[in-house]
Amino acid sequence: MSSPVLKCQSVHKVYVQGKESIEVLRGVNIALYPEQTVAIVGASGSGKSTLLNIMGALDHPSSGSISISGQDVSDMDEKAKARLRNAHVGFVYQFHHLLPEFSALENVCMPLLLRGVAVKEAKKEAEYWLGRVGLSHRLKHRPGQLSGGERQRVAIARALSPRPSCVLMDEPTGNLDPETAESVQALLWDLVRQNQTSFVLVTHDYRLAARMDEQYSLEEGVLAKVAPNSL
């Protein structure tokens, strides 16, 4: 069996508020393998976004370990984590987090430039991915000049442009109207499958979750695998 591209082992997360401790994650174990798709469902406030941030090394667990492409991030400094993320992990959020003063092309170039890709090559790759998401005619437009669906397409192109091992998505269509959401979901699914990328999807959409290879439910800090027909 191939090695996981991302793995969490016995992950706990505790927040301390004054004299009170709140345990958000309790011994979470999950592994994501090449080309695998995983959905995580759960009520609002159940810790799904916290788990996703820990999986992507944007946050650290109170205890337990995280490995990305076989590398344990536990003892890495923030610069090393950033390099590892940029090489192996893409992110798509409910809110696009595009830089408002930059064009669509410049936003998609950003992760490539951070990896040390030459400007000319980064622009070429960014143009390719914006074409893949149907925005070849919007290269010079800034986020404020794009619709909600177009902005999310730019965010998808940005996440996939470095060709990461896995993509972590937190309600990527939750801020869109149903018709636009369906279109973006179909696009995202096709692109990830075509590029043989693994992904983890945090969602409230049980119908969408059922399409993934595996489904997990996060409740009271405990992550448990569930059957698609039980969603």
From Swiss-Prot:
Q: Which GO terms describe its biological process?
A: lipoprotein localization to outer membrane; protein localization to outer membrane
Q: What class of enzyme is it?
A: translocase
Concerning InterPro entries, the annotation shows: AAA+_ATPase, ABC_transporter-like_ATP-bd, ABC_transporter-like_CS, ABC_transpr_LolD-like, MacB-like_ATP-bd, P-loop_NTPase
- Cystine links in this protein are none
The residues forming a coiled coil are none
* Protein EC: 7.6.2.-
| Cell inner membrane keyword on record | yes
- Provide the family line: Belongs to the ABC transporter superfamily. Lipoprotein translocase (TC 3.A.1.125) family.
> This chain belongs to which protein, by name?
Lipoprotein-releasing system ATP-binding protein LolD
- Organism for this UniProt entry: Hahella chejuensis (strain KCTC 2396)
Q: Which gene encodes it?
A: lolD
